[in-house]
């Protein structure tokens, strides 16, 4: 679960960066990264890669990297800024190091992609996958990003559809069909995009094979 970091940052420095990323304060984040980059005489990408909230869970630590927080909050601006720092320009990070940050698993085994998918933030999901997020990674509960987005979709349906049921019933059947065809929940949008993405294709195929195998096994 741990990610090998290029440098060692103080707990206070990491806390400041986490606060900036979580609160969505881009100016403060840029300022803190610049200061730390100067202090450690290294590229800002090293700072981003090294900023892991590694405090034990029982002491309030999450084990998350900076990408987790904007991904969870749907803050595309902060997330895209951090990804740009990691992946663009003379970062002096190799591909494996970038991948380690993008796919970093926190204390619960969740990556930034898991959090973005769970909270149905499609643009954040797209940005992370574009930066190399692995769609197939599962958390400690054995769940991948697609399943988490599906679960969010189920929760939305359970909470939001019941009050409207009576109204739907009095609508013409054709109108109901058109409305359903024209609308897609945020969770479903994330699921469909992940499964249709190049990296999600293999995941969908594997899921289909597993379902078929399970069905075959139940008939024997």
Regions found by a protein language model. Give the residues of each.
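Conserved hydrophobic site in ankyrin repeats
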Residues: 32, 82, 128, 161-162, ...
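Ankyrin-repeat inter-repeat connecting loop/turn
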Residues: 49-52, 56, 89, 102, ...
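Ankyrin-repeat-protein effector appendages
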Residues: 1-17, 150-220
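Ankyrin repeat boundary/linker residues
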Residues: 59-60, 95, 105-106, 139-142
